[in-house]
A protein has these predicted regions:
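Hydrophobic secondary-structure segments that place a key small or acidic residue at a functional site
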Residues: 52-62, 71-162
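Hydrophobic, regular-secondary-structure patches
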Residues: 1-57, 67, 81
């Protein structure tokens, strides 16, 4: 089951699973926490969407997300601290990025969006090619996405357009 903000179910699947459309919006953090605490729910992971780097999407999540897709680390490590990222294999290959590189994200999914220059990301790892959507993603913590937008970690973004 995929849970997200009100809107088109197709758009929710395209944005939340395949990362091919704009997100439908945010749900309240309290609602997400309640769902995760439900004993009938086996697995949840958050997705904080809305930014990119050179057309590759940045996804704020937790370490359960890459485990769900059974992707392995080829070089370096998973992100551990705010503003650290682990790159999908195609992202690293196409952009020529490696562990230790830094980059500035753009707001939105097209090049030229407003940049988050005050919060550069640091590459800490690169996933091995997996044949999954993770190959095309830049993964980081949800807290990193909040920081990039100048929002205090834990703030409810349900009414925000990020």
């Amino acid at each position: 089951m995929v849970v997200g903000a009100k809107g088109s179910p197709t758009q929710l699947i395209l944005s939340g699973i395949y990362h091919l459309d704009v997100p439908t919006g945010n749900i309240r953090l309290a609602d997400a926490d309640a769902l995760a605490a439900n004993p009938m729910v086996k697995e949840t992971f958050p997705l904080a969407l809305g930014d990119s780097f050179r057309s590759f999407r940045i996804v704020g999540t937790n370490h359960d997300y890459p485990r769900h897709y059974k992707v392995a680390i080829a070089v370096g490590t998973l992100w551990e601290n705010p503003l650290e990222v682990t790159l999908g294999a195609l992202v690293a290959r196409d952009l020529g990025l490696t562990v230790g590189d830094r980059f500035i994200a753009s707001h939105g999914f097209a090049d030229g969006g407003s940049a988050h220059a005050q919060n550069p990301y640091l590459v800490t790892g690169i996933f091995a090619p997996s044949g999954t959507v993770v190959d095309r993603l830049i993964l980081t913590s949800v807290q990193s996405v909040w920081i990039a937008h100048g929002v205090s970690p834990g703030t409810d973004l349900a009414k925000d357009d990020h």
